[in-house]
Every structure is written in C-alpha cells, then in structure tokens.
Amino acid sequence: MTTILKSLPKGEKVGIAFSGGLDTSAALLWMKQKGARCYAYTANLGQPDEADYNEIPRKAQEFGAEKAVLVDCRTQLVHEGIAAIQSGAFHISTGGITYFNTTPLGRAVTGTMLVAAMKEDGVNIWGDGSTFKGNDIERFYRYGLLTNPSLRIYKPWLDQQFIDELGGRAEMSAFMTAQGFAYKMSAEKAYSTDSNLLGATHEAKDLESLDSGIKIVNPIMGVPFWREDCNVKAEKVVVRFEEGQPTALNGQTFTDPVALFLEANAIGGRHGLGMSDQIENRIIEAKSRGIYEAPGMALLHIAYERLVTGIHNEDTIEQYRISGMRLGRLLYQGRWFDSQALMLRETAQRWVARAVTGEVTLELRRGNDYSILNTESPNLTYAPERLSMEKVEDAAFTPADRIGQLTMRNLDIADTRTKLKLYTDTGLLSGSEGSQIFRLENDKG
C-alpha cells in the first residue's frame, strides 16, 4: 500500500495538524471543497505566542472540519524535555552555547499524540504543513507511522493541484477572502518562528543570510539583552533537583512540572538566558541556520550539569557526554523513540540522573552570562580536604603514596618512548634540529 498520497483522497477522512494560521486554514478549506472529510487536530504545546487555544478548533469547524480536537500535549512535552536534560541529549553547540533540541522534542510529542487522537476517531490519513526541504517532514513521517502502522500521509504542499491553485500566501489570502472569511495575512516578518513551551526557533528569510544576526530577532520568551536600553538586573536563583527531577525554584516546590517549567522560563527569560545562534546539519545533510530561545531549558541544564560534575566520576561524565551527543542527534533525526535512543536515554536516567539530588545557586546577568554561587548535595563526591594545600589530619594520601603512584607511571612512559622511537625510525615523526621535541612529519617547519 502506498504510504504517501500525491493527490487528495476524496471522500475519505483526512486529519490535518491545524495551527489556525493562514496556511493550514486555507488547506483545510480547500480540502473540504475538493471532497475530503476533514478532521482538525491542534496540539496545545504551550506556545508563548499563542493567545487563545480554545479558539483554534472553533475556527477549524468554520472552515469545514467535521470534527476539531484540541490535544493538551504540555505535560508530555515537559516530560520529554526533562528526559533530554537528564540524558544530555544535545549535539549542536557553538562556543559552548547549546541548542536544546526544543523543536525536535515538540515534533516527537506532536507526531505521536495527534496521530493517536486521529486513530481513536478512525482517521488514518494525516496531513501537516511541513515542506519537503525541512526536517519535520521526516520527523512527522516516522512518529506518525510508529504510532499508527496503517497511517497514510497526504500533504497539501506535496500536491501539485494545491500548489498550482494556492501556491503562495498571497493566493491563500485571496482564496479565503473570496470564500467570505476575509482572512488577512499577518504582517510579514523578516524570519519565521516556531515555538513550544520548551523553546522557540527563528529561521528562514533574512536569517538565511549569515550577515543578519540575532539583533533582527524580537524574542518571544525573553528580552533583547543586546540592546543598551534593555534593563536587565542581576538575579540570584536557586534550583533544586531530587533524583534527577527538577522540583523547586527559589524555595518554591512544584508538583506540576508544567508550572515549574513556566516559572523557569520566566526566570531565565528575564535575562535572555538560553538564546543561541547555530549553524546545523539538517537530516538531509544540508546546512541551515537558526536563532534559538530556551530560557527554562538552559536554567535547568546549567544546574543539572553542575550537580552531575560534582557527583559522578570522570568516566561516568565522559559516557554521559558522548552518549548525550549521540542521543541528541537521534532526537534531531526523529528517532527519539527508536530502540537505540531508548537504550541511551534509559541508561543516563538510571545511572546518572538518579543520583542527582541537590541545590545550585546561580547569579543570572545578561544573556548567557551567569555565575555559579553555591552547590549543595548529599551525594557530592567533591571533598576539598583531599586536595587541600593546607596541612590536614588524616590526609587521603601522603607524599610517599604519590611517589609510588608516579613510579608506576614509568611503565607506560617507557612504552610510549619506545613507540615514539619506532615512529621516528619509520618517518612518521621527526625531531627538530637541536631539540628533543617530536613533530609529526607534516608539521615540519
């Protein structure tokens, strides 16, 4: 059976991921007029730029949907966001500033929960607004078929008839007006924005040019901290984790993880924390550029990693970072629920996150400028007396112990010296004139 439909399946139930914007509104009305039985599904992802979610299903029914459903995805989204923090599932960074994979996390939740809701209504054909050049078309494809193996995909933006009739936003606006809906296009921005409770993505249009920077972006989750007229005061923040779960901010305990994340967003957003400018490789290996916001993710990530480094040993931290980068890439590719991702994620949650209990006190300033003021945990393995430069009683080790430890290093030093001589004899290394320092053959100079 063909999975991807190239033309509208007339007379059949077709579910559309409906945002209420011009694109999906025009698509829904067009599909209805062409003979499809339209069902609209809207994900409440806690988008910071969405004023009234309850209005969206009503609009869908006005445009011809037989049924319009609002699916509350916020709790699941926060659950996945915390799992990503616990497992360090972030592979894109520039100069130590991280992209927190907030859009891939949103797609994992949307793609599974909306298709599950459609399946309950007997809807086995799904359409959404993703284009053929982006990542989302593959992410939604994977998550949709994982959730419903009988699913078929119909995307208006892959249907040549739809493109010919309503190929651009101007045509869509004119179409809606002609049908009596007087749908006006929103003011055209210099970039496009996609957001959820975890973060916001700004990309495309002017941001495709690398000489257009972060300063053209109007943040929706924080403040434009780069502007001189933006007043940002330093703020002390205390973040508490219990067995890997964030539980309290500034002494206030949260039983609702969504409420905690909203507060973390508010705190981090006051400073512009978590904004980054990244060049990344899309799934199809072409590079794209985005400006990202994730104030709450950044705040929790900083505190979590501080506790990780104070609690776990070096080899555990190394595996956490290596596995986290691999897991981040799988998440980005739409494989968050694949077995290889679940294996990496569960390992980190069990053996790394479970030990992370404690409080971290930070001072937030402008943007990603912060200081860590204090770290407390009953599980800390940081013991300053072990390495104190002062004289201490019951020292962990003595000078004689260190002499013995260094003497044992003679074994591998001798082996290394032998290997360096071998490499020199074979021409891989050379010694510079008048020096015993080895150089790689192609480093001569």
Swiss-Prot record:
Binding site for L-aspartate: T131, N135, D136
A single Gene Ontology CC term: cytoplasm
Subcellular localization, as worded in the UniProt entry: Cytoplasm
Top EC group: ligase
Annotated residues for binding of L-citrulline: Y99, N135, R139, S192, T201, E203, E280
Residues the entry annotates as binding ATP: A17, F18, S19, G20, G21, L22, D23, T24, S25, A43, G129, T131, D136, D194
UniProt-listed GO biological process terms: argininosuccinate metabolic process; L-arginine biosynthetic process; urea cycle
Catalytic reaction(s) noted: L-citrulline + L-aspartate + ATP = 2-(N(omega)-L-arginino)succinate + AMP + diphosphate + H(+)
Biological or metabolic pathway of the protein: Amino-acid biosynthesis; L-arginine biosynthesis; L-arginine from L-ornithine and carbamoyl phosphate: step 2/3
PROSITE patterns reported for this sequence: ARGININOSUCCIN_SYN_1, ARGININOSUCCIN_SYN_2
Gene3D superfamilies in UniProt: 1.10.287.400, Argininosuccinate synthetase, chain A, domain 2, HUPs
Alphabetic keyword roster: Amino-acid biosynthesis, Arginine biosynthesis, ATP-binding, Cytoplasm, Ligase, Nucleotide-binding
UniProt main location, coarse: cytoplasm
EC numbers on record: 6.3.4.5
NCBIfam families xrefs: argG, PRK05370.1
Self-association state and partner proteins as the record states: Homotetramer.
Official protein name in the record: Argininosuccinate synthase
Species in which this protein is naturally found: Bradyrhizobium diazoefficiens (strain JCM 10833 / BCRC 13528 / IAM 13628 / NBRC 14792 / USDA 110)
Lineage: Bacteria, Pseudomonadati, Pseudomonadota, Alphaproteobacteria, Hyphomicrobiales
This protein's encoding gene: argG
